[in-house]
Design a protein with these regions (language model features):
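GHKL (Bergerat-fold) ATPase N-terminal catalytic module, capturing the glycine-rich phosphate-binding loop
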Residues: 1-188, 196
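GHKL/Histidine-kinase-like ATPase module
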Residues: 12, 192, 206-208, 212-220
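Membrane-protein biogenesis/insertion across secretory and organellar systems
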Residues: 20, 197, 210-214
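Intrinsically disordered or highly flexible coil/loop and linker segments, enriched in small
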Residues: 36-37, 108, 204-207, 211
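Juxtamembrane extramembrane loops of integral membrane proteins
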Residues: 185, 191-204, 209
């Protein structure tokens, strides 16, 4: 669940480190022929985060999670779609490493080689999070690591290479991805549409996926 925001301390603002400025137009417009798969990517990220938390808990590196959960919430008034998980979360340093540093030594060559087959890019580089920008004009990520003494942080980006990273508030470990939808992508604040996508892409994922508190997927 997303907690109410208060005044936050700015930790950093800067530019996402990318090898080519072509990557954002590709992600925003042509990563997939069908924009709807952003939901699959974000839910899959949440499932991965839950698995990582379970593995880390075995070694005592972080707190345990009793049952993994992906929650999806719609705010029609704010035109937002939020995907939340109770996975391992991230520290500010991990956000900088995994979210800001979209940089790979072979990125430019790969983009050039596969620019007409852009579906491949997400899977090859693990850029599933950035599929958010196919439907959102602004993306906020609120995350808190399951490691002891961790401070929650809020990362925000408007689809350009610029970002802000602030101290945030989140009661429990996990991550919220808040999509501020573009005006021509408002189909994704329709409950029926989201329910259909959960059934299509997430039915047999190994954790519960709920919409407004109602479990939707069948699970394994």
């Amino acid at each position: 669940m997303v907690e109410k925001k208060t005044t936050m301390t700015l930790l950093e603002e800067g530019q996402i480190q990318i090898h080519t400025e072509n990557i954002f137009p590709i992600i925003k417009k042509a990563v997939y022929s069908d924009h709807e798969v952003f939901l699959r990517e974000l839910v899959s990220n949440g499932v991965d985060a839950i698995s990582k938390r379970r593995m880390a808990a075995v070694t005592g590196d972080c707190s345990e999670v009793e049952e993994g959960l992906i929650e999806i919430k719609i705010d029609r008034e704010a035109k937002t779609l939020t995907i939340s998980d109770n996975g391992i979360g991230m520290t500010s340093e991990e956000v900088k490493r995994y979210i800001n540093q979209v940089a790979f030594s072979s990125a430019e060559d790969f983009l050039e080689k596969y620019k007409k087959e852009s579906d491949v890019i997400i899977g090859h580089f693990g850029l599933g999070f950035y599929s958010s920008f196919m439907v959102a004009k602004n993306v906020e990520l609120i995350t808190k690591s399951a490691c002891p003494e961790s401070q929650a942080v809020i990362w925000s980006c408007d689809g350009s290479p610029k970002f802000t990273l602030n101290e945030g508030e989140r009661e429990h470990p996990g991550t919220d991805v808040i999509l501020h939808l573009m005006d021509d992508e408002l189909e994704y604040i329709e409950p029926t549409r989201i329910r259909t996508l959960i059934t299509k892409y997430c039915d047999f994922m190994p954790v519960e996926v709920s919409l407004e508190g109602e479990p939707i997927n069948k699970r394994n």
